[in-house]
Amino acid sequence: MATAVAEELLLAEERMLAALAYLQCAVGCAVLARNRETNLAYGRHASPSFRVRVPARAAWVVQELPSLALPLYQYASESAPRLRSAPNCILLAMFLVHYGHRCLIYPFLMRGGKPMPLLACTMAIMFCTFNGYLQSRYLSHWAVYADDWVTDPRFLIGFGLWLAGMLINIHSDHILRNLRKPGDTGYKIPRGGLFEYVTAANYFGEIMEWCGYALASWSVQGAAFAFFTFCFLSGRAKEHHRWYLQKFEEYPKFRKILIPFLF
C-alpha cells in the first residue's frame, strides 16, 4: 500500500513538472503581450513611482541565489537518482555555471548600477525559485538519457550554442561595464563585439545560451525556459533600442534590436 502511494506521488510530480513547463510558456506569452504596452520597470526604464528600492549588487545576488542553491541541493542530495548519469550531470552543471556567474561574479563586477525596485527584485526571486526547482528537479529525478547522449548531434550542437552564448553574454557585459571611465556619468553608445550589429548583444547571448541548453536537454522544461527567456528579453531589448534612438541622434541606424541582420 505504502509503495503504491509513493509511486503515485512520484508520477504526480512528473506530471506536475510538465504542467509547470507549459505554465512557463503561457506566462512567457503574457509577458510578451504586456511588453508591447508597458515599459519594463527596472534599470534605466524604472518608473520614479517605485519608491522602495534595493541596491543593485544586493538585488542581483539575492534574486539569482535560488537558481544556484536549488541545483546545488540536488547535487548534494542522495535521493537524486538521475544524477548518476553523465548527461544529467553535465546539463545541470550548465545551468549551475550560468547562475554561479550571475550570483557570485557578475554583481561584484558591476560599476555603480541603479537600485532596483523592490517589486522587480521580488518577481525575479519568484521566477528564479520556480525555474530553479523546475530545471533541477527534472534533471535530477526524471530526465532519462542514453549513456551516449553526450555524443548525439542535438547535445553537441546545443552545448556549443550554450557555450558560445555564455561567452557572448559575458563579453557584452564587459563592454557595457567599461563604457564609463572613472568619474564619468551618463550613458554612452556601446561599441565592439556584437554591439556592432545589435543593440542588445548581452541579451542575444543569453537567449542563445538557453536555446542551446534546451536543445541539449531535448525537454519540454528546457524549451519552456528558453521560450520564456526570449519573451522577456526581447521586450527589454526593444525598450533599449527605442531609448538609444531617442537619446542619441548619432546612434547607428543599421543596428538591429536583438538578432543580427534579422530583428
From Swiss-Prot:
pH dependence: Optimally active at alkaline pHs.
GO biological process, one term: androgen biosynthetic process
GO terms under cellular component: endoplasmic reticulum membrane
Membrane-spanning residues: 16-33, 90-110, 115-135, 155-175, 213-233
Keywords, ordered alphabetically: Differentiation, Endoplasmic reticulum, Lipid metabolism, Membrane, Microsome, NADP, Oxidoreductase, Sexual differentiation, Transmembrane, Transmembrane helix
Classification via Pfam families: Steroid_dh (PF02544)
Reaction it catalyzes: a 3-oxo-5alpha-steroid + NADP(+) = a 3-oxo-Delta(4)-steroid + NADPH + H(+); 5alpha-pregnane-3,20-dione + NADP(+) = progesterone + NADPH + H(+); 17beta-hydroxy-5alpha-androstan-3-one + NADP(+) = testosterone + NADPH + H(+); androst-4-ene-3,17-dione + NADPH + H(+) = 5alpha-androstan-3,17-dione + NADP(+)
Enzyme class: oxidoreductase
Compartments in which it is found: Microsome membrane; Endoplasmic reticulum membrane
Membrane topology: Multi-pass membrane protein
Function: Converts testosterone into 5-alpha-dihydrotestosterone and progesterone or corticosterone into their corresponding 5-alpha-3-oxosteroids. It plays a central role in sexual differentiation and androgen physiology.
Protein name: 3-oxo-5-alpha-steroid 4-dehydrogenase 1
Recorded name of the encoding gene: SRD5A1
